[in-house]
């Protein structure tokens, strides 16, 4: 579950498709939107950790679920596995603290974004990504105000993203239909 976070998942999980393995690969203008816990996770990765993550990311289609991927990670590096589980549990606790409507919204986003992962050897389909982002934004906008407010407390960075003018301009330009 640690592949989320634009609209609860979009940036993070999409980044999981092109895992940067280093905060230095993320443009400066986007770094302010990344939660400290995620920054710390990446900041504390060793070269060996990054190599392990790259190797496992290249095999993502072979894992039946997240637990299988974590088990493979554990077999490669118990220390890295512990870090990943800690981050996963942090995010999972935030999601689990939500009321049913907000939790359903987040779970739906996670499922949608995970479905965008390309098959082995394939590239991420940018048009599908754009459509998924448009769908997620439309679903967010359709939420009642109470649910939107509830999402703010456990996910302050997501709120910051959604309400940031600079990000909105970047997102609108990216999401334009070709």
UniProtKB/Swiss-Prot annotation:
GO cellular component entries: extracellular region
Signal peptide per UniProt: 1-16
Free-text description of this protein's post-translational modifications in UniProt: N-glycosylated.
GO molecular function, one term: retinal binding
Chain coiled-coil ranges: 67-89, 123-153
Cellular localisation: Secreted
Glycosylation: residue positions: 44, 75, 157
Main localization of the protein described in the UniProt heading: secreted
Keywords: Coiled coil, Glycoprotein, Lipid-binding, Retinol-binding, Secreted, Signal, Vitamin A
Xref: Gene3D superfamilies: 1.20.120.1100
One Pfam family matching this protein: Gp-FAR-1
Function: Binds retinol and different fatty acids.
Protein family (similarity comment): Belongs to the fatty-acid and retinol-binding protein (FARBP) family.
Name recorded for this polypeptide: Fatty-acid and retinol-binding protein 1
GN (gene name): far-1
């Amino acid at each position: 579950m640690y592949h989320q976070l634009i609209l609860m998942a979009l940036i993070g999980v999409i980044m999981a498709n092109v895992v940067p393995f280093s905060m230095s690969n993320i443009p400066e203008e986007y770094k302010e939107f990344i939660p400290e816990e995620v920054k710390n996770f990446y900041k504390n990765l060793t070269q060996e950790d990054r190599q392990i993550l790259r190797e496992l990311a290249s095999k993502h289609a072979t894992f039946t679920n997240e637990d299988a991927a974590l088990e493979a990670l554990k077999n490669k590096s118990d220390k890295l596995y512990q870090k990943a589980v800690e981050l996963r549990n942090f995010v999972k606790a935030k999601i689990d603290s939500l009321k049913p409507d907000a939790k359903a919204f987040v779970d739906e986003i996670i499922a949608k974004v995970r479905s965008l992962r390309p098959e082995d050897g394939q590239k991420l389909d940018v048009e599908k990504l754009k459509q998924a982002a448009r769908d997620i934004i439309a679903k967010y906008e359709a939420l009642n105000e109470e649910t939107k407010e509830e999402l703010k407390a456990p996910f302050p960075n997501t709120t910051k993203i959604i309400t940031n003018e600079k990000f909105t301009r970047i997102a609108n330009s990216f999401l334009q239909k070709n």
